[in-house]
Amino acid sequence: MNSKTGPSVGDATLRRRIKPWEFVAFFNPQELRKETCLLYEIKWGNQNIWRHSNQNTSQHAEINFMEKFTAERHFNSSVRCSITWFLSWSPCWECSKAIRKFLDHYPNVTLAIFISRLYWHMDQQHRQGLKELVHSGVTIQIMSYSEYHYCWRNFVDYPQGEEDYWPKYPYLWIMLYVLELHCIILGLPPCLKISGSHSNQLALFSLDLQDCHYQKIPYNVLVATGLVQPFVTWR
């Protein structure tokens, strides 16, 4: 291994790590890449965590994972299994349906999903699919800076001295996706509009909020996106 590479030679996950440029390109919330990257962790009971990654090929990355998982793993219904996904795009409605079917078949498995972007979030089928996933017990959250840092440390073959990676884009971009995910889960109309530039495939964000958004979206989310001013208590 090159001496300038960060993870140690004895790191068992080294061969399964992705390149730094891949991580930055796949998980930038403003870059509208067509491909999907899935970083995942699997933990059986008190055993060590298994980490790996895959991408969409002839089918979506989520389907690839579930097919590979069921083909290679021996299931013991008495042992709890926790799975964590870090996805560059949120699941489409068909993948959401397949995930619910997968979890129904394996009740000892729990799933948490962290996403960097919402996939065609204006489409009602995709919105309903995510909403039903949450209602079925799946944790879905937008990746924060801490998740980006965690993925960098555990999934990326980072250069020596650069183990403390933090994204260079504004936190507001993340909070805009957080805002829209709340709309989806609460069954509210879309408030975030995303358009892409054909020249560089970067997303352009705009907001269109209604009274229902101000009434039902958590106050701290509205403050974080600058939509309302925080309360000030005078003494």
UniProtKB/Swiss-Prot annotation:
<dbReference type="GO" id="GO:0051649">
    <property type="term" value="P:establishment of localization in cell"/>
</dbReference>
<dbReference type="GO" id="GO:0005634">
    <property type="term" value="C:nucleus"/>
</dbReference>
<feature type="active site" description="Proton donor">
    <location>
        <position position="62"/>
    </location>
</feature>
<dbReference type="GO" id="GO:0006397">
    <property type="term" value="P:mRNA processing"/>
</dbReference>
<dbReference type="GO" id="GO:0005737">
    <property type="term" value="C:cytoplasm"/>
</dbReference>
<protein>
    <recommendedName>
        <fullName>C-&gt;U-editing enzyme APOBEC-1</fullName>
        <ecNumber>3.5.4.-</ecNumber>
        <ecNumber>3.5.4.36</ecNumber>
    </recommendedName>
</protein>
<dbReference type="InterPro" id="IPR016193">
    <property type="entry name" value="Cytidine_deaminase-like"/>
</dbReference>
<dbReference type="GO" id="GO:0008270">
    <property type="term" value="F:zinc ion binding"/>
</dbReference>
<keyword id="KW-0378">Hydrolase</keyword>
<dbReference type="GO" id="GO:0010332">
    <property type="term" value="P:response to gamma radiation"/>
</dbReference>
<feature type="binding site">
    <location>
        <position position="95"/>
    </location>
    <ligand>
        <name>Zn(2+)</name>
    </ligand>
</feature>
<dbReference type="GO" id="GO:0006641">
    <property type="term" value="P:triglyceride metabolic process"/>
</dbReference>
<feature type="binding site">
    <location>
        <position position="92"/>
    </location>
    <ligand>
        <name>Zn(2+)</name>
    </ligand>
</feature>
<feature type="binding site">
    <location>
        <position position="60"/>
    </location>
    <ligand>
        <name>Zn(2+)</name>
    </ligand>
</feature>
<keyword id="KW-0479">Metal-binding</keyword>
<dbReference type="InterPro" id="IPR016192">
    <property type="entry name" value="APOBEC/CMP_deaminase_Zn-bd"/>
</dbReference>
<dbReference type="GO" id="GO:2000623">
    <property type="term" value="P:negative regulation of nuclear-transcribed mRNA catabolic process, nonsense-mediated decay"/>
</dbReference>
<dbReference type="GO" id="GO:0016554">
    <property type="term" value="P:cytidine to uridine editing"/>
</dbReference>
<dbReference type="Pfam" id="PF18774">
    <property type="entry name" value="APOBEC4_like"/>
</dbReference>
<dbReference type="GO" id="GO:0042953">
    <property type="term" value="P:lipoprotein transport"/>
</dbReference>
<dbReference type="InterPro" id="IPR041547">
    <property type="entry name" value="APOBEC1"/>
</dbReference>
<dbReference type="GO" id="GO:0035925">
    <property type="term" value="F:mRNA 3'-UTR AU-rich region binding"/>
</dbReference>
<comment type="similarity">
    <text>Belongs to the cytidine and deoxycytidylate deaminase family.</text>
</comment>
<feature type="domain" description="CMP/dCMP-type deaminase">
    <location>
        <begin position="10"/>
        <end position="131"/>
    </location>
</feature>
<dbReference type="GO" id="GO:0030895">
    <property type="term" value="C:apolipoprotein B mRNA editing enzyme complex"/>
</dbReference>
<keyword id="KW-0539">Nucleus</keyword>
<dbReference type="GO" id="GO:0042158">
    <property type="term" value="P:lipoprotein biosynthetic process"/>
</dbReference>
<dbReference type="GO" id="GO:0090209">
    <property type="term" value="P:negative regulation of triglyceride metabolic process"/>
</dbReference>
<dbReference type="GO" id="GO:0004126">
    <property type="term" value="F:cytidine deaminase activity"/>
</dbReference>
<dbReference type="GO" id="GO:0016556">
    <property type="term" value="P:mRNA modification"/>
</dbReference>
<dbReference type="GO" id="GO:0042127">
    <property type="term" value="P:regulation of cell population proliferation"/>
</dbReference>
<keyword id="KW-0507">mRNA processing</keyword>
<comment type="function">
    <text>Cytidine deaminase catalyzing the cytidine to uridine postranscriptional editing of a variety of mRNAs. Form complexes with cofactors that confer differential editing activity and selectivity. Responsible for the postranscriptional editing of a CAA codon for Gln to a UAA codon for stop in the apolipoprotein B mRNA. Also involved in CGA (Arg) to UGA (Stop) editing in the NF1 mRNA. May also play a role in the epigenetic regulation of gene expression by participating in DNA demethylation.</text>
</comment>
<keyword id="KW-0963">Cytoplasm</keyword>
<comment type="subunit">
    <text>Homodimer. Interacts with A1CF; form an mRNA editing complex. Interacts with RBM47; form an mRNA editing complex. Found in a complex with CELF2/CUGBP2 and A1CF. Interacts with HNRPAB. Interacts with SYNCRIP.</text>
</comment>
<dbReference type="InterPro" id="IPR002125">
    <property type="entry name" value="CMP_dCMP_dom"/>
</dbReference>
<dbReference type="InterPro" id="IPR050610">
    <property type="entry name" value="APOBEC_Cyt_Deaminase"/>
</dbReference>
<dbReference type="GO" id="GO:0003723">
    <property type="term" value="F:RNA binding"/>
</dbReference>
<dbReference type="GO" id="GO:0044029">
    <property type="term" value="P:positive regulation of gene expression via chromosomal CpG island demethylation"/>
</dbReference>
<keyword id="KW-0862">Zinc</keyword>
<dbReference type="GO" id="GO:0048255">
    <property type="term" value="P:mRNA stabilization"/>
</dbReference>
